[in-house]
């Protein structure tokens, strides 16, 4: 354990109902209810619903698919998220659609129009929920030749104009991909280019931004903790956000990014090693306003596909000085 390090707790999570890149959960209503009970018990009170509509090569997936629930209480999985969030006192940020075909064809104006129509429809549909307090720009991590900054800017402008009562949120990644889809920006390049071409443009439109932290390796040599560069990211991005009046949060990813010597190929996203999570939390805590994660339901919950997720949750609670016995009380 680290001495004199005060960790901020994870106080929110994404909810990914369509893409199974971090594992297939096959949760039923009781499983979801237990997850919400657990989150409430440990201080997670924000839900960021990601990718509610997806399209690729003409194939579409929807969080409003009536086959997504096998219980009568909810017509679809998206209805359930809103209902349980209301019941357990959560704050919901709703993310929009994403069409890979639009992006690959360079039809970014259609992507903007699809987002506008989606938010018009869903804000009206779910506006009666008191928990519904924010909108989330889902498209956030594609390279320059897909015009993703133009899309995000126009969607944020539409949100602010048409839904001024809603807070706005994004979660792009540190070290975003360059146009070659391989190399990444270093921190100074990221702050300069993302600053000039995006964040300065959306000053006053974007309330909160939680960059995906990406750095996983808990670098250490003979017991001495080494600098892995993540602190520099928080410091320099924090300065940029302060100039743009954007509150700096962080998305501490709870899936394992491959790092040298770990023996896993890229694209394998199981739950994180608890030492990596400890490193991420200790570095971010003094420098950000809020910590959220991608994501509790498929990586930290005992309901996940991954066998050690229950133990990851137990180690996380120990980091915060909490008794992991609550896991057995809720999940048996």
Task: Name each model-derived stretch.
Residues 1-49, 61, 129-132, 324-332:
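Mature N-terminal, pre-catalytic/accessory segment of carbohydrate-active enzymes
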Residues 7-14, 45-48, 89-93, 131-136, ...:
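Structural preference for beta-strand elements that scaffold enzyme active sites
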Residues 29-100, 147-170, 222-241:
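Aromatic-lined substrate-binding rim segments of carbohydrate-active enzymes
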Residues 35, 46-48, 206-221, 236, ...:
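Substrate-binding cleft of secreted/luminal carbohydrate-active enzymes
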Residues 55-74, 100-111, 260-267, 306-308:
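Surface-exposed, active-site-proximal loop segments in enzymatic domains
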Residues 72-88, 107-134, 151, 155-158, ...:
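An active-site-proximal structural segment forming one wall of the substrate-binding cleft
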Residues 97-102, 118-148, 209-212:
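Active-site groove signature of glycoside hydrolases
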Residues 130-143, 170-174, 190-227, 296-299:
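Aromatic- and acid-rich polysaccharide-binding/catalytic face
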């Amino acid at each position: 354990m680290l001495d004199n390090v005060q960790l901020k707790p994870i106080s929110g999570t994404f909810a990914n109902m369509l893409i199974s890149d971090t594992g297939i959960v096959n949760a039923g209503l009781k499983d979801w209810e237990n997850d919400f009970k657990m989150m409430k018990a440990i201080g997670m009170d924000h839900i960021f619903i990601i990718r509610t509509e997806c399209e690729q090569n003409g194939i579409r997936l929807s969080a409003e698919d009536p086959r997504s629930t096998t219980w009568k209480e909810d017509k679809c999985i998206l209805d359930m998220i809103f209902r349980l969030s209301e019941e357990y006192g959560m704050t919901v940020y709703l993310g929009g659609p994403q069409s890979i075909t639009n992006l690959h064809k360079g039809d970014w104006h259609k992507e903007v129009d699809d987002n506008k129509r989606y938010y018009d429809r869903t804000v009206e549909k779910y506006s009666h929920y008191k928990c519904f307090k924010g909108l989330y720009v889902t498209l956030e991590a594609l390279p320059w030749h897909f015009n993703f900054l133009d899309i995000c800017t126009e969607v944020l402008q539409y949100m602010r104009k048409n839904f001024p009562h809603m807070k706005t949120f994004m979660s792009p990644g540190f070290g975003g991909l360059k146009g070659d889809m391989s190399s990444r920006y270093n921190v100074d390049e990221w702050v300069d280019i993302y600053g000039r071409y995006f964040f300065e443009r959306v000053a006053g439109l974007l309330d909160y931004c939680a960059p995906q932290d990406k750095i996983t390796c808990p670098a250490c040599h003979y017991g001495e903790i080494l600098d892995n560069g993540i602190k520099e990211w928080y410091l320099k991005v924090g300065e940029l956000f302060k100039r743009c009046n954007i509150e700096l949060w962080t998305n501490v990813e709870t899936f394992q990014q491959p790092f040298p010597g770990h023996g896993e190929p890229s694209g394998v996203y199981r739950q994180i090693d608890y030492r990596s999570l400890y490193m991420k939390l200790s570095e971010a805590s003094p420098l950000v306003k809020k910590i959220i994660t991608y994501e509790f339901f498929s990586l930290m919950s005992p309901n996940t596909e991954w066998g050690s997720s229950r133990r990851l949750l137990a180690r996380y609670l120990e980091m915060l000085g909490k008794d992991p016995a609550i896991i057995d009380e809720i999940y048996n």
